Amino acid sequence: MEEYTKAEILIEALPYICKFHDQKVLIKYGGHAMVNEQAKNWIAKDLVLLKYVGINPIVVHGGGPEINRAMEKMGKTPEFIHGLRVTDEETLEIVKMVLIGKINGDIVSKLELYGGKAVGLSGKSGQLIKAKKKIQYLMKDSQKIEVDLGMVGEVEHVDTKLIDILVEKRYIPVISPIGVDHQGNDLNLNADIAAGDIAGAMNAEKLIMVTDVDGIMDDIKDPSTLHRKLTISQIEGMIERGLITGGMIPKIEACINALDKGVQSVHIVNGKTPHAVLLEIFTEDGVGTMVVRE
């Protein structure tokens, strides 16, 4: 009976394997979902399996918790505005050290441990991400004021040629969110927003944001308030009502941006759920919150 059940589970995945065969799926691997060792193993196995059944995962990773720890060790206090890290020159060097120097290589090694072929990149590789300094505005006393985030960028252009070559050669690209401006200066990119831009440029079928929450909820402390499916207009209403704040704001911005650029659906899932990526792609009910245009 147990063997029959296993076979049924495999057969349930068949329509989705057919549907998404040779499609690109952008996986945004969030900082908080990378802390748990078991969760890291689940995600790596999921991505390798996707590749072997003919689906093309592309990874963009963050690293917020490890960046925070590195900053604190160096006597710096992390500062955020609307979920975006304020980045001076010293902070940018720490960000690059952690993202490019440590986390990217760790993810590549984990994927290769489970039989995948992976290549670590940053937005600097092959002029992958051209960026410009981000101008951030806040409302204060009913007035719009400009806030200086420092060396924080936003994506101007994604050159997909290098990613296309790697995908064609059966590699899993793993991308650190560091961009370069037209003067050759490095800029810190929010990983969620960069993932949305890359997903759109790559014509990805899905963007899956792996984080440490179950999805979009009215009350983060009450799992029963989880939304299984939302449209852009519904999300915009939640922002207006103050139900979406802090670090979830860049995720939502990335969702909307990716959908506007042609991605069919965006999914926010909890990386601490065993094999969340496989459950999202290969089961009828999926997991987390799905966001669609309308």
UniProtKB/Swiss-Prot annotation:
Annotated pathway: Amino-acid biosynthesis; L-arginine biosynthesis; N(2)-acetyl-L-ornithine from L-glutamate: step 2/4
EC numbers on record: 2.7.2.8
Stored InterPro entries: AceGlu_kinase-like_sf, AcgluKinase_fam, ArgB, Asp/Glu/Uridylate_kinase, Glu/AcGlu_kinase, NAGK-C
Catalytic class of the enzyme: transferase
A single cellular component GO annotation: cytoplasm
Enzymatic reactions: N-acetyl-L-glutamate + ATP = N-acetyl-L-glutamyl 5-phosphate + ADP
Keywords, in A-Z order: Amino-acid biosynthesis, Arginine biosynthesis, ATP-binding, Cytoplasm, Kinase, Nucleotide-binding, Transferase
A Pfam family this chain is assigned to: AA_kinase
GO molecular function (one): ATP binding
Biological processes per GO annotation: arginine biosynthetic process via ornithine; L-arginine biosynthetic process
UniProt binding sites for substrate: 63-64, 85, 188
Site location (Transition state stabilizer): 28, 251
Subcellular location field: Cytoplasm
PANTHER family per the UniProt record, alphabetical: N-ACETYLGLUTAMATE SYNTHASE, N-ACETYLGLUTAMATE SYNTHASE, MITOCHONDRIAL
Family: Belongs to the acetylglutamate kinase family. ArgB subfamily.
Role, per record: Catalyzes the ATP-dependent phosphorylation of N-acetyl-L-glutamate.
Protein name as it appears in the record: Acetylglutamate kinase
Native organism: Methanococcus maripaludis (strain C7 / ATCC BAA-1331)
Gene that encodes the chain: argB
